Amino acid sequence: AAPVEFTVEKGSDEKNLALSIKYNKEGDSMAEVELKEHGSNEWLALKKNGDGVWEIKSDKPLKGPFNFRFVSEKGMRNVFDDVVPADFKVGTTYKPE
């Protein structure tokens, strides 16, 4: 299993996605996280807020399921496809297959 979990946080809706990302790698953490909407070729950067939650805010509804790409502090790169579904629920944790 992948060493990462995505939990949808409060404030998430059709235009906003807020995620707690748990990365289970000793001594390493997320440096950059990007999201790609369903049917898109464009990666969009998430910003980390003061609470350690990664957020993306959009002017128009986001289209899931969502793919994620990240770079860790130690330079580990990974892409996870279709992790968070279009009908995500706040408080639910999603893990890549």
Swiss-Prot record:
InterPro entries per record: Allergen_Lolp2, Expansin_CBD, Expansin_CBD_sf
GO BP terms, alphabetized: plant-type cell wall loosening
A Pfam family it matches: Expansin_C
Major localisation: secreted
Compartments it resides in: Secreted
Keyword Secreted: yes
GO cellular component: extracellular region
Domain (Expansin-like CBD) ranges: 15-96
Keywords in alphabetical order: Allergen, Secreted
Family: Belongs to the expansin family. Expansin B subfamily.
Name assigned to this protein: Pollen allergen Lol p 2-A
Annotated source species: Lolium perenne
